C-alpha cells in the first residue's frame, strides 16, 4: 500500500507506541511520528513492519480531543480517510473526522481490532487462552469447589462439615470434634470455600496467645491463606496508615488477650466490618448468667457485629451443660436466651436420641417410640414410613435412613453444632506403650539433695516441675555447659534404640528447646545419627526445612527432635515411633504430644517409648498417666477433669517422688473416676448429631469424587503450558516434584506467588502431605488462579493467524475460529459462577457461515496448524479484511442463539435450586427454631439478585484466529 503524509499506521513490533502518523516519505524510506510517546521511527518502504489503521462502519473511534463517534461511512481522498458518523456525547449526526485527528493513544481491545491493526499473537498463546477459558468455566461448575485445594488428607467427616457449612450464608456454628479429629482443618476448609466463592472477604481469627503461630502456619501451609498477625507493635504501626488499624489487612489473627486488654482496640475490631470471626479454644470463655468473664463479653460484643461466626471448642460433654449453652448463646442469642428452657429442651430430646440409636441398630421400636417420632417429625402421612422402618421388609433400611435424615433436619442444635467422636469415626491406629525404667545417676541424686536443701522455701508446684527435669537441676549448680548427657542413662538408651532401628523414622519430644539442641549434637557426634531439630526459636521456613528433611525417605533425617512448643500444630503421621525423653506436666499436653502421630491417616500402630528415671517425678507421672488415666494407649477426654480434682495430691507426690505412701490408692481412685466419667460420656453420646456431623456415605462419596479429581492430568498439562508461556523455568527434581524459578523474559516482571529464589511444587497430594517445603498445586492454588487471571484479564492470545496445509481444500480458503464468552456481571458474593461462569462458545466458520466446530475438535485442529510471523500475517489480514468482517457478522447471528440457550438453562437451574432451598428452609423453620430469620431473608434476596443478574447476561467476542489454507 502506498504511503501518504497524514496517514495513520501502527507498528507491528512496538504496539505500545500507539497510533503513528506518516510525516515524511522519500523514494526508499518512510518516517512515522508516534505522538503519544513523542518518538519517531524510520522504516524501509518496501518491507516495513507497520499496518495501516482503517476503521469500518459500526466501529467506535475517539478524536484527539477526547470525544467519541460511531462510524457510519468511510471516505477516501488522495490516500487519506475521513470518517463520518454520530458523536456519542452530543448525538450530532453527519460529523466528519479526518484520520489525522484520531486519538494517538489508541488501544485495540477487541480481538478483531487487534487483528486488523496487526497486533497478532503467537499461536500457542491463542491455544492457551482458549484452554484457560474452558478449564476456568469447568472448575466453577464443580460441586465441591473450594474443597480440593487444601494440603490435607481427604477425610470424609471433615469434608462433610466443610461442604455443609462452607456454602451457607454467614455460617454461625460450633465445631466441637474430639481432639485429633481436625477442628482447625475444618475451620480452614470453611474459610477457604467462603473466600474463594466471594461469600466472605474479611476474616478475623482469635486464638490463645500460644496458638497464634500455629494458626498462621496452618492457614498458609494448608490453605495458601496469608494472614497478618496483630500484636501491640503491629497495631501501633498500623495506626499511622489508617484510622482503624484493622482496615489495613483483610485476613487477621490476634490473641484473645490482645483483643480484650484495650477498650479502644475492641471497638476498632468491632467496627472493622469482618465477614467471618473464628474463635479457637472457645471453651475457655467463662460464663455464668450473673457474671460472664471479660473474655466472654469481648467475644460476645464481636459476635454481635460479625455476620459469620465459627467457634472451636472441646466436646459439649466435657464442658458441662451451662458452658455448652454459653457457646450456643454467642451464636444465636435470640434462640438461646434462657438456660432453664435449654436444659428442659435437652431433657426432652434424650428419648429421641435413644430412638435414633435403636433405628440405627436395626432394633424394633415400641408403639410409644413410634408415636414420639411421629410427633417429633410433625409431617402428614408419616405413618407408612414409620411402619416400613419398623418392618422386616427390604425397604426397612432405606426407610430408617430417611427417618434419621428427617430427624437431623429438625434436631434441636444440628444446624449450629457439629461434633465427631473417635467412636464415630474410623481410621485411627492403636497406641502401644513401652516404658523403660532407668537408674537415677549419682550426679543427679546429689544435685536433687542440694536443690532440696536450698529450695526448701519453693512451692510444691515449683519443686514438682524441677523434679520432672533432673538435668536442669544439675545444670543449675554445674552451669549451663554441664555435660549431663555424658552420664544420663536416657541418652545411652536413646542412642542404642536409634542405632538398632536405623530404618525407622522416630519423633523425639522433650519439654525444652535446649534439650533438643543438646541431644542433636550428641547423636551426631557420637553415633553419626542424622537428626533434625524443631523448636520455637526457629522461623517458619526453618521449621519447614527441618520437617521436609525428616520426611525424606532415603536421604532424610532418621530422627526429629522437637520441643514442646515448637511441635504445636505439626503432624508427622508418616512416622509411627515416638520417644518421650521427658513427660509433660498435664494430660492435655501429653495428648498433644501423641497427637503429632495419632491422626486419621496414620498407617501403622503408634509405638510410644518412655525412658524414665526412677525416684524422680517422671516415675510418678508415668504411672499416674498410664495406670490412673490410661492416657498413653487411649485418648483421655476425662484427663483434665481428674487432673483438676487431684491436683494438690498429685503435686505433692511429684515434689517428693520417694514418698509413695498412699500413691497406689490415688491411682486406684483416679482409675475408678476415669471409668465412671467415661461411661457417663458414652451414655451421653448423641448418635443423631454424630451421624449428621460425619456425613456417612455422602461424605465418603465426596472424598472419592475429590480423589478422582486429584488424578486430573489436564491440570498438569495446562500448568506446564502456562508456565512456559509466562516464562517460568521448570526443573524436574524427581519424586513428583518440580522447581519453578523466574526467567529473565517473563510475561510480567513479578508473577504473584513466585519468589525470586523460586518454589518447589507438586501435583501429588501424598507428596505434599509428606513434604512441607513443596506447594500442592491444584486448580485452586493461587499460582494457577493468578495465571488464569493474567491470561484472561488482558488480551494475551486474543488474535492470531495460522496456516492450514490441506490439499483437499483450495489454496486461499479462509476459516475464522471465534471464541465467544457468555457471561453475566454480578458482585462476587452472589456466586453467580455456580450457574453461569464465563462460558466459552467456540465456532469455526467458513465464508458461507457454516460452523464446523462440532466436526473439528480444537486440540486435533490446533496440531494441524502452522504459525505465521507477524509481518506476513499483517499482509494476509489486509488482503482478506472485508471477508473477515463478513464472517464476523455471520458469527454474531449464530452466537445470539447459542448464548440465549446457555442463559436460559442457567436461569432455570438457578430458579429451581434457589427456590427449592428457600422452600426447604421455610418448611424447616416451622419445626426447627435454629434456622435464623436473616438466613431466610438472605436466601430470598440472593435468589432475586441472581435472577436479575442472569436477565442482564450477554456475550462478547474473546478471541479469534484467522486460518488460511495453503498447499506448501
Curated annotation (Swiss-Prot):
Domain Helicase ATP-binding: 164-334
First-tier enzyme category under EC: hydrolase
This protein's record includes keyword Cell inner membrane: no
Residues in Helicase C-terminal domain copies: 490-662
MF GO annotations: ATP binding; DNA binding; helicase activity; hydrolase activity, acting on acid anhydrides
EC number: 3.6.4.-
UniProt binding sites for ATP: 177-184
Keywords: Activator, ATP-binding, DNA-binding, Helicase, Hydrolase, Nucleotide-binding, Transcription, Transcription regulation
The keyword Disulfide bond appears for this protein: no
Location of the motif DEAH box: 280-283
InterPro entries: Helicase_ATP-bd, Helicase_C-like, Helicase_RapA, P-loop_NTPase, RapA_C, SNF2-like_sf, SNF2/RAD54-like_C, SNF2_N
A Pfam family the protein falls into: Tudor_RapA
GO biological process entries: regulation of DNA-templated transcription
HAMAP family given in the database record: Helicase_RapA
Family of the protein in this entry: Belongs to the SNF2/RAD54 helicase family. RapA subfamily.
Function of the protein: Transcription regulator that activates transcription by stimulating RNA polymerase (RNAP) recycling in case of stress conditions such as supercoiled DNA or high salt concentrations. Probably acts by releasing the RNAP, when it is trapped or immobilized on tightly supercoiled DNA. Does not activate transcription on linear DNA. Probably not involved in DNA repair.
Subunit comment: Interacts with the RNAP. Has a higher affinity for the core RNAP than for the holoenzyme. Its ATPase activity is stimulated by binding to RNAP.
The protein's name in its UniProt record: RNA polymerase-associated protein RapA
Amino acid at each position: 500500500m502506498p504511503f501518504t503524509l497524514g496517514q495513520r499506521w501502527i507498528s507491528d513490533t512496538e504496539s505500545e507506541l500507539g497510533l503513528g502518523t506518516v510525516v515524511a516519505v522519500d523514494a526508499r524510506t518512510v518516517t512515522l511520528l508516534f505522538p503519544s510517546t513523542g518518538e519517531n521511527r524510520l522504516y524501509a518502504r518496501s518491507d516495513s513492519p507497520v499496518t495501516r489503521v482503517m476503521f469500518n462502519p459500526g466501529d467506535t473511534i475517539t478524536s484527539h480531543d477526547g470525544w467519541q463517534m460511531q462510524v457510519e461511512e468511510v471516505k477516501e481522498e488522495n490516500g487519506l480517510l475521513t470518517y463520518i458518523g454520530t458523536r456519542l456525547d452530543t448525538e450530532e449526526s453527519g460529523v466528519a473526522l479526518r484520520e489525522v485527528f484520531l486519538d494517538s493513544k489508541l488501544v485495540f481491545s477487541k480481538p478483531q481490532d487487534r487483528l486488523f491493526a496487526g497486533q497478532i499473537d503467537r499461536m500457542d498463546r491463542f491455544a492457551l487462552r482458549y484452554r484457560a477459558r474452558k478449564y476456568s468455566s469447568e472448575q466453577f461448575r464443580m460441586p465441591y469447589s473450594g474443597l480440593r485445594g487444601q494440603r490435607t488428607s481427604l477425610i470424609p467427616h471433615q469434608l462433610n462439615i466443610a461442604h455443609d457449612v462452607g456454602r451457607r450464608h454467614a455460617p454461625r456454628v460450633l465445631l466441637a470434634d474430639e481432639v485429633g479429629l481436625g477442628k482447625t482443618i475444618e475451620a480452614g476448609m470453611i474459610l477457604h470455600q467462603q473466600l474463594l466463592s466471594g461469600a466472605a472477604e474479611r476474616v478475623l481469627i482469635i486464638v490463645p496467645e500460644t496458638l497464634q503461630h500455629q494458626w498462621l502456619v496452618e492457614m498458609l501451609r494448608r490453605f495458601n491463606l496469608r494472614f497478618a498477625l496483630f500484636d501491640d507493635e503491629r497495631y501501633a504501626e498500623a495506626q499511622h496508615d489508617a484510622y482503624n488499624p484493622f482496615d489495613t489487612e483483610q485476613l487477621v489473627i490476634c490473641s484473645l488477650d490482645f483483643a480484650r486488654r484495650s477498650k479502644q482496640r475492641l471497638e476498632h475490631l468491632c467496627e472493622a466490618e469482618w465477614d467471618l470471626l473464628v474463635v479457637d479454644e472457645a471453651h475457655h470463655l467463662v460464663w455464668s448468667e450473673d457474671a460472664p468473664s471479660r473474655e466472654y463479653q469481648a467475644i460476645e460484643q464481636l459476635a454481635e457485629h460479625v455476620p459469620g461466626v465459627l467457634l472451636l471448642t472441646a466436646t459439649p460433654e466435657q464442658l458441662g451443660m451451662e458452658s455448652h449453652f454459653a457457646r450456643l448463646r454467642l451464636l444465636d442469642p435470640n434462640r438461646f436466651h434462657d438456660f432453664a428452657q435449654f436444659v428442659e429442651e435437652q431433657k426432652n430430646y434424650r428419648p429421641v436420641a435413644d430412638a435414633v440409636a435403636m433405628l440405627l441398630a436395626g432394633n424394633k421400636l415400641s408403639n410409644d417410640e413410634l408415636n414420639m417420632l411421629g410427633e417429633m417429625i410433625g409431617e402428614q402421612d408419616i405413618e407408612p414410613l414409620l411402619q416400613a422402618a419398623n418392618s422386616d421388609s427390604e425397604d426397612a433400611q432405606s426407610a430408617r435412613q430417611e427417618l434419621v435424615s428427617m430427624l437431623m433436619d429438625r434436631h434441636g442444635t444440628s444446624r449450629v453444632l457439629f461434633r465427631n467422636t473417635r467412636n464415630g469415626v474410623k481410621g485411627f491406629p492403636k497406641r502401644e506403650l513401652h516404658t523403660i525404667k532407668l537408674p537415677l545417676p549419682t550426679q543427679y541424686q546429689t544435685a536433687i539433695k542440694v536443690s532440696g536443701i536450698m529450695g526448701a522455701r519453693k512451692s510444691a508446684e515449683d519443686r514438682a516441675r524441677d523434679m520432672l527435669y533432673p538435668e536442669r537441676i544439675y545444670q543449675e549448680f554445674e552451669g549451663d555447659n554441664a555435660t549431663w548427657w555424658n552420664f544420663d542413662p536416657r541418652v545411652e538408651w536413646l542412642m542404642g534404640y536409634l542405632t538398632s532401628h536405623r530404618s525407622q523414622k522416630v519423633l523425639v519430644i522433650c519439654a525444652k528447646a535446649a534439650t533438643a539442641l543438646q541431644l542433636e549434637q550428641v547423636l551426631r557426634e557420637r553415633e553419626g545419627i542424622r537428626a533434625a531439630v524443631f523448636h520455637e526459636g526457629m522461623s517458619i521456613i526453618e521449621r519447614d526445612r527441618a520437617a521436609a528433611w525428616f520426611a525424606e525417605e532415603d536421604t532424610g533425617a532418621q530422627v526429629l527432635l522437637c520441643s514442646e512448643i515448637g511441635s504445636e500444630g505439626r503432624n508427622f503421621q508418616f512416622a509411627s515411633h515416638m520417644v518421650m525423653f521427658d513427660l509433660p506436666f498435664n494430660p492435655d499436653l501429653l495428648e498433644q504430644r501423641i497427637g503429632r502421630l495419632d491422626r486419621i491417616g496414620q498407617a501403622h500402630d503408634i509405638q510410644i517409648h518412655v525412658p524414665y528415671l526412677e525416684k524422680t517425678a517422671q516415675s510418678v507421672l508415668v504411672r499416674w498417666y498410664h495406670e490412673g488415666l490410661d492416657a498413653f494407649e487411649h485418648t483421655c477426654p476425662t484427663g483434665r477433669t481428674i487432673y483438676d480434682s487431684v491436683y494438690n495430691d498429685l503435686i505433692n507426690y511429684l515434689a517428693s517422688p520417694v514418698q509413695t505412701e498412699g500413691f497406689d490408692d490415688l491411682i486406684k481412685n483416679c482409675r475408678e473416676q476415669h471409668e465412671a466419667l467415661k461411661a457417663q460420656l458414652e451414655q451421653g453420646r448423641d448418635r443423631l448429631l454424630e451421624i449428621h456431623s460425619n456425613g456417612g456415605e455422602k461424605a465418603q462419596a465426596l472424598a472419592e469424587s475429590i480423589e478422582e479429581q486429584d488424578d486430573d492430568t489436564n491440570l498438569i498439562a495446562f500448568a506446564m503450558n502456562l508456565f512456559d508461556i509466562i516464562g517460568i523455568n521448570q526443573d524436574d527434581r524427581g519424586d513428583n516434584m518440580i522447581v519453578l524459578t523466574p526467567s529473565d523474559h517473563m510475561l510480567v516482571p513479578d508473577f504473584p506467588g513466585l519468589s525470586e529464589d523460586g518454589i518447589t511444587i507438586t501435583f501429588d497430594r501424598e507428596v505434599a502431605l509428606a513434604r512441607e517445603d513443596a506447594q500442592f498445586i491444584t486448580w485452586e492454588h493461587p499460582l494457577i488462579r493468578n495465571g488464569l487471571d493474567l491470561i484472561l484479564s488482558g488480551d494475551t492470545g486474543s488474535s492470531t493467524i495460522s496456516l492450514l496445509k490441506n490439499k483437499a481444500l483450495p489454496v486461499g480458503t479462509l476459516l475464522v475460529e471465534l471464541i465467544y464468552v457468555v457471561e453475566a456481571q454480578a458482585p462476587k458474593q452472589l456466586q453467580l459462577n455456580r450457574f453461569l461462569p464465563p462460558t466459552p462458545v467456540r465456532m469455526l466458520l467458513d465464508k458461507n457461515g457454516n460452523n464446523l466446530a462440532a466436526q473439528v475438535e480444537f486440540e486435533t485442529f490446533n496440531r494441524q496448524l502452522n504459525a505465521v510471523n507477524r509481518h506476513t500475517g499483517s499482509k494476509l489480514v489486509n488482503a482478506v479484511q472485508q471477508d473477515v468482517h463478513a464472517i464476523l457478522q455471520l458469527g454474531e447471528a449464530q452466537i445470539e442463539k447459542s448464548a440465549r440457550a446457555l442463559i436460559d438453562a442457567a436461569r432455570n437451574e438457578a430458579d429451581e435450586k434457589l427456590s427449592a432451598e428457600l422452600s426447604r428452609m421455610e418448611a424447616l423453620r416451622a419445626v426447627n427454631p435454629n434456622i435464623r430469620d436473616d438466613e431466610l431473608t438472605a436466601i430470598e434476596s440472593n435468589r432475586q439478585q441472581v435472577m436479575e443478574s442472569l436477565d442482564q447476561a450477554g456475550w462478547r467476542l474473546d478471541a479469534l484466529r484467522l486460518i488460511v489454507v495453503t498447499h506448501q
